[in-house]
Amino acid sequence: MTATLVKSKLKTFFGGIHPKEDGKALTSSKKEVSTLLPKIAYLFMSQHIGAPAKPNVKKGDIVKKGQLIGEAQGFVSANIHASVSGKVVDVLPWLHPVTGIKSPAVIIENAGEDTWIEGANESSDTDQISPDEIKQRIQSAGIVGLGGATFPTHVKLTPPKDKVI
């Protein structure tokens, strides 16, 4: 599937807010508030640098939170998981809010049940698993960096053999 360029104005803003004093002091005493989950979730297969994931669900499928809905397509790619449980209402190119380009997306109608896949919240004693197993779990989870490029973390953890770190 190829992305289609569409005429759009990307939403952006200038500057932002930069408090001169300790910015955390402005909110550290504030109460935390939970946000509501969306009725419809648009999950793009390109949430990272590199090849977009390939959707592995289809219209009409019932998915659970944490379920793999997009499979990485190469080493520099990342798996995508459902952030809500519900019914897949469509899989199609949709206007990406960041890039302004139509990109493959899985659209899920939230059932409002917050049903997770089995094993999603299991933890392991990290002292008992090998570095390769940790790297494999990071890759399976689709973890990416938050530095702006959303680079797949497993790639960063796999330097060339001759590279001294």
Indicate where each model-derived feature is located:
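Well-ordered secondary-structure scaffolds
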Residues: 1-165
